[in-house]
């Protein structure tokens, strides 16, 4: 409960000029050696109707003087007790501190308010449960470099040297630049690289740059700068990776400035899909087209985004010089997006990729690619014929045309379009294997026989004639006569000989007369 006097003092904002010193003392509104005191506003006071101070500044002054009465008055005016304690610590007025000691639950709370290192240390000493390391940690946290300087020799003591790393990290986390610089120059930091992780996480370029000063100055002092070039590059590459992963272009440029590898930076930008960083580096560093093409291979290998691929292709005008290498990566990594982008720019590498797929990939990969790019069966089969992939042709043609008769029909049409003899022979062999695997209708077998004659497929025709004779006998008379005419017209003597043999069988069986035979041969002349 407040007394009536306290209530009056708390709410007095104006003092009459004719109040005597005695009256002011009686009211408790007199500050020894300063004069009258009263509230001016909520957070300030007026001394002797002239000097205006904030309540907390006045509290610190009263604490320095050990004036408990004024402290009590200022607390009544909603001042912060911490400032009175700080003032008392500064001038070692421990009577005042003892009076209010019980009201301070945690002495660490006062530390951010203290500017003087000696007072700072005195305040921390009142935290009886804390140790020397706790003092150093708070010195770092609240930027009291002089305390660290004071205890430098203690920090170098082998018993607590291991604490240097945690103090360094704390300084970095609180961005105490002066302390970081001092630690770097005066103390052995076990893992100085921590500064870079913190700088990247907080996007603090100044801290990032300071890290290089600390590391390279240390190496210089130790005389190992040249000997550590390999280690240096490992560190720089790691920093490039961190910076690019977080999309921090200024950090990338800072690392390059300190010797980072531009090609490594470009590679990381590609693999991390950092298009803006990649674009900037290519333009500013005048990257050569062959290097950009290698980056394109890397982008394909890593399944990079459309934007990344488009950017790289745009720098080489969508013209790939080493098509073979690009195709190899597309096939190996099953990364076809680049083909679609090139198709949009009228650059077709689909056939080249299909050829490599047919050569080196599985049925499932080829089928997926054919479906993805809507490739015509004729195009695929011609490539597969050229590469002698009979099993692949049989499997995929079966997928396309489930009906064997339909399959043979379409394959026969493709044979007509193949210009070279070995290719036609290869595909005809496949057609014959399909015939051997299924039971075709009689009329389809007859069509196949005439097809064999037209392409001089001697062995297959002979095989078909044998089947027809054994299963249809004399019913094949018309076919043999037709085949005789075709063989003569195309000048295929071996086929003509086979047909003549079966015409003799027909004659022996009485299915054809001598006159009909003579008439057939006369028609050929």
Swiss-Prot record:
Short name of any one Pfam family annotated for the protein: DUF249
Keyword Protein transport on entry: no
The keyword Repeat is assigned to this record: yes
Repeat (ANK) residue spans along the chain: 54-83, 129-158, 261-291, 324-351
Record's function text: Plays a role in virus cell tropism, and may be required for efficient virus replication in macrophages.
The name this protein goes by in its record: Protein MGF 505-6R
InterPro entries per record: Ankyrin_rpt-contain_sf, MGF_505
Similarity remark: Belongs to the asfivirus MGF 505 family.
Record's keyword terms, sorted: ANK repeat, Repeat
């Amino acid at each position: 409960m407040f007394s009536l006097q306290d209530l009056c003092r708390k709410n007095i904002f104006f003092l009459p000029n004719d109040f005597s010193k005695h009256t002011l003392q009686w009211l408790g509104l007199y500050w020894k050696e300063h004069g009258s005191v009263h509230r001016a506003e909520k957070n300030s006071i007026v001394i002797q109707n002239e000097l205006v101070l904030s309540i907390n500044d006045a509290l610190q002054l009263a604490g320095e003087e050990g004036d408990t009465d004024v402290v009590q008055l200022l607390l009544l005016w909603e001042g912060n007790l911490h400032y009175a304690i700080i003032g008392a610590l500064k001038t070692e007025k421990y009577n005042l501190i003892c009076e209010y000691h019980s009201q301070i639950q945690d002495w660490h709370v006062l530390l951010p308010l203290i500017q003087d290192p000696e007072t700072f240390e005195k305040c921390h000493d009142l935290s009886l449960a804390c140790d020397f390391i706790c003092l150093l940690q708070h010195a770092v946290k609240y930027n009291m470099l002089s305390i660290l300087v004071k205890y430098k020799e203690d920090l170098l003591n082998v018993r607590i040297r291991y604490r240097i790393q945690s103090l360094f990290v704390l300084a970095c986390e609180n961005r105490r630049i002066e302390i970081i610089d001092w630690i770097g120059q005066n103390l052995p930091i076990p893992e100085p690289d921590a500064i870079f992780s913190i700088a990247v996480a907080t996007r603090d370029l100044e801290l990032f740059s300071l890290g290089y000063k600390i590391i390279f100055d240390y190496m210089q002092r130790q005389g190992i700068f040249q000997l550590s070039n390999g280690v240096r590059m490992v560190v720089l590459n790691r920093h490039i990776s961190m910076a690019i992963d977080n999309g921090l272009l200024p950090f990338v440029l800072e690392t390059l400035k300190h010797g980072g590898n531009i090609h490594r930076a470009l590679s990381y930008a590609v693999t991390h899909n950092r298009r803006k960083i990649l674009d900037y580096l290519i333009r500013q560093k005048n990257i050569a087209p062959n290097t950009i093409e290698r980056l394109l291979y890397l982008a394909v290998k890593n399944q990079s985004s459309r934007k990344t691929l488009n950017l790289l292709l745009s720098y080489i005008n969508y013209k790939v010089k080493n098509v073979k290498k690009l195709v190899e990566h597309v096939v190996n990594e099953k990364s076809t997006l680049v083909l679609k982008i090139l198709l949009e720019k009228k650059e077709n590498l689909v056939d080249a990729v299909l050829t490599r797929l047919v050569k080196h990939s599985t049925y499932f990969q080829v089928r997926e690619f054919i479906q993805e790019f809507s490739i015509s069966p004729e195009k695929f089969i011609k490539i597969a014929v050229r590469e002698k992939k009979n099993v692949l042709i049989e499997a995929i043609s079966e997928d396309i045309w489930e009906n064997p008769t339909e399959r043979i029909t379409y394959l026969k049409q493709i044979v007509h379009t193949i210009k070279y003899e070995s290719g036609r022979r290869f595909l005809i062999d496949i057609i014959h294997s399909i015939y051997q695997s299924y039971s075709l209708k009689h009329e389809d077998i007859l069509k196949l026989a005439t097809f064999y004659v037209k392409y001089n497929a001697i062995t297959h025709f002979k095989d078909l004639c044998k089947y027809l004779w054994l299963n249809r006998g004399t019913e094949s008379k018309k076919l043999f006569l037709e085949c005789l005419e075709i063989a003569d017209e195309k000048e295929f003597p071996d086929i003509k000989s086979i047909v003549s043999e079966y015409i003799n069988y027909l004659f022996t069986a009485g299915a054809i007369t001598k006159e009909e035979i003579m008439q057939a041969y006369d028609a050929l002349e």
